[in-house]
Design a protein with these regions (language model features):
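Extracellular beta-strand elements of beta-rich domains used
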Residues: 27, 94, 134, 160-164, ...
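Carbohydrate-binding surface patches
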Residues: 198-202, 207-211, 641-678, 684, ...
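Extracellular and organelle-lumenal recognition/adhesion modules and their flexible linkers in secreted
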Residues: 13-243, 247-248, 253, 257, ...
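Aromatic- and carboxylate-lined catalytic core of secreted/periplasmic carbohydrate-active enzymes
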Residues: 574-671, 684-688, 698-719
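Catalytic-core region of carbohydrate-active enzymes that cleave or remodel glycosidic bonds
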Residues: 514-595
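An acidic-aromatic substrate-binding cleft motif
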Residues: 269-327
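Substrate-binding cleft and catalytic face of glycoside hydrolase catalytic domains
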Residues: 324-504, 510-514
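Structural preference for beta-rich elements and adjacent junctions enriched in aromatics
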Residues: 60-61, 171, 777-977
Length: 977
């Protein structure tokens, strides 16, 4: 039925108007630019993707899409993300017919600010072609949309002539351009080499034309590009297809495209990878990297989440992950199958659907490990979501105990299952999975939900029971997190102290506050601490980094932590892997799987199952692939001794050669590295860097191979790109600005500096590999700085940290009606007296004083140093003074790990819910030889019952733990009259 094709001549003018926003809307180019997702229930067991076909039964042109759905599962056809004007009306129309009468659903889908917004309309579909329409006003804040067609009926749906246009009604259909083209490959990844590329083009007009096309492949991150030209004879109303050979020799994230005088082809994105060894890795013998979840068995509102196929069978999906370097996958119960369905009644277990999933994973080259507990240890008491109700009812039928809410857990209450139920669940699960699963992690982030002692009891039961069920299994435990501001160090140390290490084969951690070597707590420093625990309590226990979704540099954290928290640059992933491997970690699975794949919307990180688009490995996946390519089977030889600002590790590969990985800690402070001819250098993705004698080293690691690398990589091989760098500026008080300079050489450097808007000339000497702060008088909130380091004059516009509150030694201060305090500096102590008014005493969680009524002190002994670091570091101390809680916990004084609380004198007097007291902190307890000017803040936390109601802060707010730049300042001298 081709009656619309006959209208082509009549709408020739409309073809050039661009009214239709959808590319390949007539589907003459197959599914190019579009995505198809189909769900396959676990009981199916085959986990195969829908084979989309082109049908000659069409409305427009020669083809339509044919979507066969023999099992009646969900099938979704998705457009690419299309820019739209918020506040305007848009009409989505598409011609549909079906092999049997059914109902389809048209929808507008927008991923905005971390949420999915979907508005749908159901339409009847018959055996005859019918145009279906959906009109929607685009809400404010939705600059792009995806339109979708979906159905859940057995049978075949045909789709053709889709159109998205501005306005409140559908106009006559017209393609988005007179000529359209696309380039595609069979997979979204390949190894480097010459590869076949499919080129398709369609001419919607009536006249034949010979069109010169330029087909390209480019890697935006490396600057590589290749091009092939071809002339194509396009008959009127015809589609042509050609196979061409392209040399895809540059590894990384590559985009295939084509252009001609009047247009551009629909691009095809893929990853070009290094070829990796086949077969499974052994986490007990070699370093392994991996991800959290397979990503394609997501929550679909059912107890047994189905396979959500993205144009690829599950076996192919796992093959793709392995090609990117994934050798282990951390699996959760919500991906495997809901615990209340696996264990619906005491003594009853149903593993049939789970086994189909485990069988499929076991056939792959990837080793699974399962995190046990997700829904057994927390419930949502108020949610009406059917899944939450099912969890709640399932748990309460087991007579377990509800606990008090813990910090970081939103809308959830931690619970304690009966140990007999926990024991039965572990035994049945491990016995069933024996031979297919060897590794089990006991609980995800238990420090958010229970004390170390309680956790250790569940860990011991799981360990003993699992070993009886499968003597070959391995137990991973602890799994403490620093996310949500949680304290991981104390939990891990307490668990180790009470004997938890006797009941695990590896202990895992989530280092959210120590993600990189540029973090406030450098990654290697945290690993030193964890390795010390391991050495003290059980040296043979392995270290596993099982989750770290936010691997941010300092600049990344400022830009993306709130708006796009899972933002990831490929160099940061490589750095994390190298640090983990070099410091003795055995397994590193920091990422969620979709962090290794291209985003299909510019607005947020969203997994491709929501868009139905193919999963395309991104630059981070290519960087991971290169890491595994160079260091598979290698042994770490240790951290290299390099100049400040440069980091790196040395490894011996399986064939006995040396490989070093080096990088600059921060992009703004690069180094030149002189390279001898006999040294081979490779970029982040494994591409050789040829004919480079002097390399500018930045945050992107490079791989070096050759002999005597440790001898070559000495301080003399590195020259700073910038001798003196300005790290930052901060107002000390109104009219007085501190600017910090960093010397990146091995020699002291004399410096002359002034502000451009006038004022004094300042002179100082910046010590070798050190920093110095200089103060200027200015009222300008963003002055321009000029400085001379002996070689040349430089300038920079400053963006200082603004003034916070200030006080003098001995001054009394009131914060609202709730808090009054004074702080005095004596030769021996910093003395703080305080009085807090409280209406009602609240409860608190053991080990988490900030969850109840308490007084917090924040001290920064170097407020004008490290001005490129807002996160609290070694100079920042946090102290808690806590009265008796409503749930019976005693008064106590505690503090951050770097604070020796045993040296601090304190007193506390309680009068009903009010409390007052005095704290005397010896200067040596905070690393000072005597009185000095401090960054300072004080907060009175107010809780009632189990809720933290408010905080009363002098200078900052409840984010002080994440930014020292919120602190005020306390001056040494008394207030001048």
């Amino acid at each position: 039925m081709k009656f619309l094709f006959a209208l082509a001549a009549g709408i020739a003018g409309a073809l050039c108007c661009g009214e239709n926003l959808l590319p390949n809307s007539s589907f003459e180019l197959g599914t190019a630019g579009w995505g198809v997702m189909n769900e396959v229930p676990k009981e199916n067991g085959k986990f195969q993707a829908l084979r989309v076909r082109s049908s000659k039964d069409s409305v427009h042109g020669a083809s339509s899409l044919e979507l066969r759905n023999p099992d009646g599962g969900l099938v979704v056809l998705c457009s690419p993300a299309v820019p739209v004007a918020p506040g305007e009306m848009y009409t989505f129309s598409v011609w549909l017919k079906a092999s049997v009468p059914m109902t389809a659903e048209l929808s507008f889908f927008s991923p905005i600010d971390g949420r999915w917004h979907v508005v749908s309309r159901k339409v009847p579909v018959s055996k005859e072609w019918k145009r279906c329409e959906f009109v929607r006003k685009i809400p404010a804040g939705h600059p792009e949309v995806v339109v979708r067609v979906q159905f859940r009926s057995e049978g075949t749906l045909f789709a053709d002539a889709a159109q998205l246009e501005r306005g409140g009604s559908a106009s006559a259909y017209s393609p988005s351009a007179p000529v359209e083209a696309a380039v595609e490959m069979p997979k979204t990844w390949c190894t480097a080499g010459e590869r076949n590329v499919t080129f398709r083009a369609v001419n919607y007009g009536t006249s034949a034309a010979e069109i010169p096309f330029s087909v390209t492949a480019r890697n935006a991150l490396t600057g590589w590009k290749t091009e092939k030209r071809l002339a194509v004879e396009l008959g009127g109303g015809k589609t042509v297809e050609q196979q061409i050979r392209l040399p895809l020799l540059n590894r990384g994230a590559v985009e295939l495209g084509a252009k001609w005088d009047s247009g551009q082809a629909i691009p095809f994105r893929l990853a070009v990878l290094n070829a990796l060894p086949r077969g499974k890795s052994d986490p007990e013998r070699e370093f392994c990297v991996g991800v959290n979840e397979t990503g394609v068995f997501r929550n679909a509102g059912t107890a047994h989440n189905p396979y959500q196929a993205l144009g690829i069978d599950f076996a192919g999906h796992l093959e793709m992950l392995h090609a990117t370097g994934v050798s282990v996958i951390r699996l959760f119960e919500y991906e495997l199958g809901r615990s209340w369905v696996i264990n619906p009644e005491r003594g009853k277990f149903e593993f049939e659907q789970l086994n189909r999933f485990l069988d499929a994973v076991a056939k792959s080259e990837i080793v699974p490990y399962i995190c046990m507990d997700t829904e057994a240890f927390s419930i949502n008491p108020d949610s009406k979501n059917p899944r939450h109700v099912a969890v709640r009812n399932w748990f309460m039928a087991r007579d377990g105990k509800r606990e008090k809410p813990l910090n970081g857990m939103k809308n959830a209450i931690p619970v304690s299952p009966l140990m007999a139920d926990w024991n039965a669940y572990i035994r049945a699960f491990v016995e069933n999975a024996r031979g297919r699963v060897r590794y089990y992690e006991i609980m995800n982030e238990p420090n958010l939900r229970m004390t170390a002692a309680k956790y250790s009891s569940y860990l011991e039961t799981a360990y003993r029971t699992a070993k009886q069920a499968d003597p070959q299994c391995r137990i991973v435990g602890i799994c403490s997190t620093e996310d949500y501001g949680a304290e991981a160090d104390a939990f891990t140390a307490n668990a180790a102290k009470i004997g938890a290490f006797a009941f695990l084969d590896a202990f895992s951690f989530h280092p959210y506050q120590a993600a990189l070597d540029s973090s406030a707590v450098p990654a290697d420093r945290l690993l030193d601490k964890l390795n010390a625990l391991r050495t003290k309590y059980r040296p043979e226990v392995q270290l596993w980094n099982s989750e770290l979704f936010y691997i941010h540099s300092v600049e990344d954290a400022k830009k993306h932590r709130r708006t796009d928290p899972q933002f990831l640059r490929p160099e940061n992933l490589t750095r994390r892997y190298v640090i983990d491997f070099g410091e003795g970690v055995r397994v590193s699975t920091p990422l969620h799987v979709w962090q290794l794949f291209e985003k299909h919307s510019a607005r947020m990180f969203a997994d491709p199952t929501r868009f139905g688009q193919k999963a395309v490995p991104n630059a981070s996946a290519a960087a991971q692939n290169a890491f595994v390519y160079f260091l598979h089977g290698a042994k770490p030889l240790g951290r290299l001794e390099l100049p400040a600002g440069v980091n790196g590790y040395l490894f011996r590969t399986a064939d006995g050669r040396e490989t070093a990985v080096v990088w600059a800690v921060e992009n703004s402070r690069g180094f030149f590295l002189s390279l001898p001819a006999e040294l081979k250098v490779f970029d982040l993705f494994g591409n050789p860097l040829e004919n480079v004698s002097k390399l500018l080293l930045d945050e992107r690691p490079v791989y070096l191979t050759g002999k005597n690398l440790k001898g070559f990589l000495t301080a003399s091989a590195f020259q700073p790109q910038e001798v003196i760098a300005v790290t930052g500026a901060r107002f000390r008080q109104t009219g007085e600005l501190a600017v910090e300079f960093q010397n990146r050489t091995a020699n002291a450097v004399p410096l002359v500096a002034r502000l451009k808007d006038g004022g004094e000339i300042r002179k100082c000497t910046v010590p070798a590999d050190g920093r110095a702060s200089v103060r200027f008088h200015t009222e300008n909130p963003a002055p321009e700085l000029l400085w001379f380091d002996g070689s040349r004059q430089k300038k920079r516009r400053l963006n200082p940290v603004s003034v916070r509150k200030t006080m003098f030694s001995g001054e009394k201060v009131r914060v609202g009606e709730a808090l009054e305090f004074s702080a005095e500096m004596t030769p021996e102590f910093l003395s703080v007296a305080f009085s807090v008014k409280d209406r009602r005493r609240g409860e608190r969680i053991p080990g988490q004083p900030w969850t109840g009524d308490c007084l917090e002190l924040f001290l920064d002994t170097a407020p004008e140093s490290g001005l490129d670091r807002h996160l609290p570091g070694a100079s920042v101390y946090r102290l808690f003074v806590v009265p008796v809680s409503a749930n019976g916990l005693p008064a106590e004084l505690s503090g951050s790990p770097n604070l020796d609380c045993g040296k601090i004198r304190w007193s506390l007097k309680e009068n009903g819910a009010d409390y007052s007291g005095k704290i005397e902190i010896p200067w040596e307890a905070i690393g000072c030889s005597g009185p000095r000017e401090l960054g300072f803040d004080i907060i009175a936390d107010d809780a009632e019952g189990t809720k933290r109601l408010a905080y009363h802060a002098w200078a900052g707010d409840d984010r002080n733990h994440a930014s020292r730049f919120q602190f005020g300042r306390i001056f040494m001298e008394s207030r001048r009259e």
